[in-house]
Regions:
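C-terminal segment of classical bacterial N-terminal signal peptides
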Residues: 12-20
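Sec-dependent N-terminal signal peptides
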Residues: 3-13
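Structural preference for beta-rich elements and adjacent junctions enriched in aromatics
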Residues: 21-286
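Extracellular/lumenal mature domains of secreted and surface-exposed proteins
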Residues: 274-358
Length: 358
């Protein structure tokens, strides 16, 4: 089989990343892809999420209470979670809606109702807190610097009231603020009352999130159809007499998912649904293979049952290959046009001066 240069590029850029073992291996949850013009506004209003089908919703029926082995009772606690993403943005969007018969949020520390989320963007697995490591013993400082580096844990206060919206259980609290995260919450109840809460937020998963800050960090690359490791738990406090006793409702059906990325579950980053797409869409990208030779590889990313491709490179030459490699004779900035077509119609994409060679 002849492997062209462009085929090699496509292979290297689309090959699946290796993933560790997951909890509930027979179950795969889905992350809805929002169209780029319908990104949710983080304002505590779930209206933007109406386009997400109910099949994406994760309810209380998918969670197990692992601390006390309590039975599900929607009159005590009931939840709904939807996950979203936008192609081209390395963000995870979350809508959390909950009913609780007793909302606890008047204590300054962690003794209150919490939505706890753990994400492992590159499926590296393994402990993310030193207490769960068995391979070596870390001293206090090394343990602190290890915490949350390759997978992140967010303790999200529901509601936060006068606290920061979440506590990052790690050495990198900077990941909870802009431009890495944002959140909004709406509710009308008071502490100790029953009622409904709506929480909207987005976070940025990191393959490497160090104590020093974002300068050395590595953001996880979110790609269509990729699997990420993720799980969440609802910590449900019910007030006196024991503020320290709470229910731990886990999507992984384990308790230590809070600190072990190998106990997360699979979430697939879904493609854009056809209802948001045209039958035929032209799109493409390129890579400069050799600037000295002005050698450029063009890569088709069009959508639809296309059977023809016409590339106009802006220098008077044309190609009908799907993924051509072109050499420019002269330096300059070029207007490149791709026209695709088939039985469903045609479309074209023009990029002005993106392709520049010297």
């Amino acid at each position: 089989m002849r492997l062209t240069f462009v085929s090699l590029i496509l292979l290297l850029t689309t090959c699946a990343r290796p993933c560790q073992a997951f909890e509930r291996p027979d179950r795969e949850f889905r992350v809805f892809q929002f169209p780029k013009h319908m990104i949710p506004c983080i304002d505590g209003d779930p209206l933007d999420w109406d386009i997400v089908p109910d099949s994406y919703r994760i309810g209380l029926d998918q969670l197990e209470e692992t601390a006390n082995h309590a039975a599900r009772d929607p009159n005590n606690l009931n939840i709904s979670v939807k996950m979203g993403w936008v192609k081209g943005l390395n963000r995870l969007y979350v809508l959390y809606e909950a009913y609780d018969d007793y909302w606890e949020f008047d204590i300054p520390g962690l003794d209150g109702d919490i939505f706890e989320l753990v994400v492992d963007g590159d499926c590296s697995g393994g402990p993310l807190i030193p207490e769960l490591r068995t391979d070596l013993k870390l001293d206090d400082r090394n343990g602190f610097l290890f915490r949350g580096v390759h997978a992140q844990n967010y303790h999200i206060f529901t509601p936060a009231a006068d606290k920061e919206w979440c506590m990052v259980w790690g050495c990198q609290p900077w990941i909870a603020g802009l431009p890495w995260a944002n959140a909004a919450c709406s509710y009308t109840f008071r502490h100790g009352e029953s009622g409904r809460l709506t929480l909207e937020f987005w976070i940025t998963p990191f393959d490497y999130a160090p104590f020093e800050g974002p300068g050395r960090a590595a953001v996880s690359r979110l790609e269509e159809n990729a699997i990420i490791g993720l799980s969440f738990a609802v910590l449900d406090h019910d007030g006196p007499p024991d503020h320290h006793r709470f229910g731990f409702w886990s999507l992984s059906h384990t308790t230590t998912m809070y600190g072990n990325a190998s106990e997360l579950v699979k979430f697939r980053l879904m493609p854009l649904e056809n209802r948001f797409r045209k039958q035929v869409e032209a799109d493409w990208t390129f890579r400069v293979v050799d600037m000295d030779r002005r050698l450029v590889a063009f890569i088709d990313r069009s959508h639809g049952p296309n059977t023809s491709w016409r590339w106009e490179f802006g220098d008077g030459t044309v190609s009908t290959e799907r993924n051509p490699v072109h050499t420019y004779e002269k330096p300059g900035s070029y207007v490149v046009v791709l026209t695709v077509g088939g039985h469903a119609g045609s479309a074209r994409m023009v990029k002005v001066w993106d392709v520049t060679v010297k």
